[in-house]
From Swiss-Prot:
Entry-linked Gene3D superfamilies: 1.25.40.180
Major place of residence: cytoplasm
InterPro entries: ARM-type_fold (IPR016024), MIF4G-like_typ-3 (IPR003890), mRNA_TranslReg/HistoneTransl (IPR051367)
GO molecular function: RNA binding; translation activator activity
An individual GO BP term: regulation of translational initiation
Annotated family: Belongs to the MIF4GD family.
Protein known as: MIF4G domain-containing protein A
Keywords noted in UniProt: Cytoplasm, Nucleus, Translation regulation
UniProt keyword Nucleus, yes or no: yes
GO cellular component: cytosol; nucleus
Parts forming coiled coils: none
Length: 216
C-alpha cells in the first residue's frame, strides 16, 4: 500500500493519515472523491485502493460509528458504473481503471464479513462487458478481465453461481468460436477457464506453463 499511498498528492495523503487516526476531523466526502478521482487515472493505484479505503471505513466505523466515507464511495462507484459505456468509448484506460477499482472495493470492504451486496451485480455487469466479442479483441480488456477473475471470481461465484456460469459460457464460446483472437488472448482465456474448472486454483505445473508463455 505504501506505493499507492505516495501516488496521491500531499493534501490527500495528509487527509488519509488523519482519517485513519481521527476520522471526525476530516471531510470524508472530499477524501472519498479524491481517492476515486485518482483511481480513474492510475491503474497501479486503483489495484490497491480498496485496502486504503478499507482502512478508512474501519476507522470511521470504530471511532465515530458512522459510514460517511463508505456511503459516498458507493455513490461515486454507482455514478461511474452508470457511465461505464460512455467511459469505455472515451478512454480505454479509464474504463479498465473503473473495473479494477470496483473489484478492489468489492474484494476489501465487507459488511458482516460478506461482500457488499449492492456491488455484486455491478461487478458482474462490468465483467460481462469485458467478455463481449468486441472486448475480447482488445488484449487490455482481456487482461483486466482475467486479473479481476483471479482476484474476486471465487467470492463472486459464492454470491451468485448462475451468473458466473453464464459468464464462463460467454468466455468458452469466445475461445472456441471467435477466430480472430490474438494468441495472447487465447492463452489468457484458456488459463482462466482452467483456473475456474480447477476450483479457482492452478496446479504448479499449469502455473509454470501459462506464466512462462506470458513472459515469452
Amino acid at each position: 500500500m505504501d506505493s499507492a499511498w505516495t501516488a496521491l498528492d500531499m493534501e490527500t495523503q495528509t487527509m488519509l493519515k488523519t482519517a485513519i487516526k481521527d476520522p471526525k476531523t476530516v471531510d470524508l466526502e472530499k477524501l472519498s472523491n479524491a481517492v476515486v478521482e485518482h483511481s480513474l487515472k492510475d491503474l497501479s493505484f486503483c489495484k490497491d485502493a480498496g485496502r486504503m479505503c478499507y482502512a478508512v471505513v474501519q476507522a470511521e466505523a470504530q471511532k465515530t460509528a458512522s459510514s460517511v466515507f463508505r456511503r459516498n464511495l458507493l455513490n461515486r462507484l454507482q455514478q461511474e458504473f452508470i457511465a461505464r459505456e460512455e467511459t469505455r468509448k472515451r478512454s480505454m484506460q479509464e474504463w479498465v481503471c473503473v473495473v479494477t477499482f470496483i473489484c478492489s472495493i468489492f474484494d476489501y470492504i465487507k459488511v458482516n464479513n460478506s461482500p457488499i451486496a449492492a456491488l455484486v451485480d455491478p461487478v458482474y455487469d462490468c465483467l460481462f462487458g469485458l467478455a463481449q466479442p468486441d472486448s475480447l479483441m482488445n488484449e487490455e480488456e482481456v487482461d483486466c478481465l482475467v486479473v479481476q477473475l483471479h482476484r474476486v471470481g471465487e467470492q463472486l461465484e459464492q454470491t451468485n453461481s448462475e451468473r458466473m456460469n453464464q459468464l464462463f459460457y460467454l468466455l468458452r464460446d469466445g475461445f472456441l468460436l471467435q477466430e480472430d483472437l490474438s494468441s495472447m488472448t487465447r492463452l489468457l482465456l484458456l488459463e482462466i477457464l482452467e483456473f475456474r474448472a480447477s476450483g479457482w486454483t492452478l496446479s504448479e505445473t499449469a502455473h509454470k506453463y501459462y506464466y512462462s508463455e506470458v513472459a515469452d
